[in-house]
Regions:
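Conserved class I S-adenosyl-L-methionine
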Residues: 2-49, 60-64, 86, 105-108
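Conserved Class I S-adenosyl-L-methionine
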Residues: 2-3, 12, 20, 24, ...
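Class I SAM-dependent methyltransferase SAM/SAH-binding core
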Residues: 50-111, 136
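Conserved hydrophobic residues forming the short capping helix/wall of the S-adenosyl-L-methionine
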Residues: 69, 91, 172, 201, ...
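Short glycine-dipeptide loop
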Residues: 71, 145-151
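A short acidic, Gly/Pro-enriched loop at the edge of an enzyme's catalytic core
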Residues: 107-122
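A short SAM/SAH-binding and catalytic strip from SAM-dependent methyltransferases
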Residues: 120-135, 157
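Conserved catalytic/acceptor-binding region of the Class I
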Residues: 135, 150-222, 238
Length: 284
């Protein structure tokens, strides 16, 4: 049984935020799927391998890892009960049987007691930035790997190189938009500085750290109006809209729709660039 020490994130991901992500999982996959192949290739998952997916959410990358190792196994770990329920249902619907999902805190989860371990690879697509104590978490993840086991993760780089951030900051004259996090503090951009990533992984005992930039376009909506509605329903957008009066909300929605209109493609869909770090390391 995991002791949950990351209580702030536990409350967030088992409340409205977790419910939102579970409900809109297909949309979030449309945003982030461009990172799947680089991530899984970097993890070097082979048939028979056991893979640990950290912050697995609704389990899309966990299922992809399981498909790469039909005679292996994939374990998805997340704090969010709503997203894990979705993950289990989708695995059943897809007929993927070599996958399991567990609710737990990567900082403290007793991986050494897991029947699925030790693991050949640990992966994370945008799920490793929210630890209250990242050194503790990554140290625990390292111990879950076999000697020679491999870590591969994708995490956002500079906020200004991510189109959704640029879209939201365009509203600063209308809504009280602050920054979206910074290296060293739990949040989306806690690992945005490569030196911070190297320091955390070194403190956790990882070796052979590599960090390279990777970019992908994600689909945020079927048109600018739909994309604006979606962005304003996400965690940051929802909090900003809740803090504003109705005239400000209407102005923000119109301004964001106008901004996103410049990113509509030939079929009308809105595609925004995301820039991330692809990080790998090993347990020696």
């Amino acid at each position: 049984v995991t002791t949950i020490v990351n209580t702030d994130q536990d409350q967030a991901w088992n409340g409205p935020e977790g419910a939102h992500w579970a409900r809109h999982q297909d949309r979030w996959n449309a945003v982030n799927d461009g990172f799947n192949t680089p991530l899984l290739d970097a993890a070097r998952i082979a048939d028979g391998h056991r893979t640990l997916d950290i912050g697995c959410g609704a389990g899309h990358t966990t299922r992809l890892a399981a498909l790469r190792a039909p005679h292996g196994h994939a374990l998805g770990l997340d704090l969010s009960g709503p997203m894990l329920a979705e993950a289990r249902a989708r695995a059943v619907a897809d007929g993927i049987h070599n996958v399991t999902f567990t609710r737990g805190d990567a900082q403290t989860h007793p991986f050494e007691q897991s029947a699925e371990g030790p693991f050949d690879a640990a992966i994370s697509r945008y799920g490793a930035m929210f630890f209250a104590d990242p050194e503790l978490a990554f140290g625990n993840i390292r111990r879950a790997l076999r000697p020679g086991g491999r870590l591969a993760l994708v995490c956002p780089s500079d906020p200004e190189l991510n189109g959704w951030v640029t879209a939201m900051t365009s509203l600063r004259g209308i809504l009280p938009v602050g920054d979206f996090g910074r290296p060293g503090l739990p949040g989306m951009f806690s690992l945005a500085a490569p030196d911070r990533v190297r320091a955390v992984l070194a403190a956790a005992g990882f070796t052979g750290v590599t960090i390279e930039e990777t970019r992908a376009y994600g689909t945020w909506g079927r048109d600018a109006t739909d994309a604006a509605d979606f962005l304003l329903a996400t965690g940051p957008g929802r909090h900003l809209m809740d803090s504003a009066d109705e005239p400000a909300r209407a102005r923000a929605r119109a301004a964001l729709t106008d901004h996103l209109g410049a990113h509509e493609t030939a079929d009308g869909t809105v595609r925004l660039l995301s820039t991330a770090w692809l990080v790998t390391a090993e347990r020696s």
